[in-house]
């Protein structure tokens, strides 16, 4: 709320112990995943029908390789704040947003290691949580790799990938 958003819209969220779901992502079945929309929450309470019909807003263009006019500095700040939470292992978002944040972040960029470029996350971010301390059978993923390439190199590779995908259709 400190960034002028009334809160966050939560999309698919894992069941506490994983398990089958009627709809949604396969990855949301282990109890460690949540989707958060890239849209400022307008007001606190929504009716059931309003929750089902809130329109998503895309933040990307060029097949996810770039951000569009809907992306703001506040999105960047919100993702930085989420990444500071020790319970967060990874944040998945479309590649163009990761590139934009890498270019524009001032100071320590280490938090951006948690932000991973992944297709299909143009309207929302996907958060993977670390295993809770009391979940003795849960195994955390390996820590995110240190970024060895510049954001421009990653963008170039992603544009090549998108171009190859479009040519194969």
PLM region spans:
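Sec-exported extracytoplasmic/periplasmic mature domains
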Residues: 1-4, 15, 41-42, 83-87
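Loop/turn elements at helix/coil->beta-strand transitions in domains of secreted/extracellular proteins
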Residues: 4-8, 32-33, 84-91
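Catalytic cores and adjacent binding grooves of peptidoglycan-active enzymes
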Residues: 46-169
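Extracellular/periplasmic catalytic domains that process cell-envelope and extracellular macromolecules
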Residues: 3, 26-31, 83, 118-121
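Acidic/His-rich structured neighborhood in mature extracellular/periplasmic domains
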Residues: 15-66
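Short, functionally critical alpha-helical segments immediately adjacent to catalytic or ligand/cofactor-binding
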Residues: 10-14, 33, 127
């Amino acid at each position: 709320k400190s960034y002028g958003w009334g809160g966050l819209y939560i999309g698919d969220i894992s069941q506490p112990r994983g398990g089958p779901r009627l709809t949604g992502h396969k990855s949301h079945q282990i109890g460690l995943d949540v989707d958060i929309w890239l849209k400022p929450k307008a007001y606190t309470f929504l009716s059931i029908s309003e929750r089902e019909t809130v329109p998503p807003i895309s933040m990307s263009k060029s097949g996810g390789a770039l951000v569009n006019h809907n992306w703001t500095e506040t999105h960047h700040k919100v993702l930085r704040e989420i990444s500071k939470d020790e319970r967060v292992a990874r944040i998945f978002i479309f590649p163009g947003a990761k590139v934009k944040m890498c270019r524009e972040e001032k100071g320590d960029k280490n938090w951006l290691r948690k932000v991973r470029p992944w297709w299909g996350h143009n309207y929302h971010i996907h958060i993977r949580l670390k295993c809770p301390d009391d979940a003795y059978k849960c195994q955390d993923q390996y820590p995110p790799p240190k970024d060895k390439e510049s954001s421009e190199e990653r963008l170039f590779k992603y544009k090549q990938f998108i171009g190859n995908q479009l040519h194969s259709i």
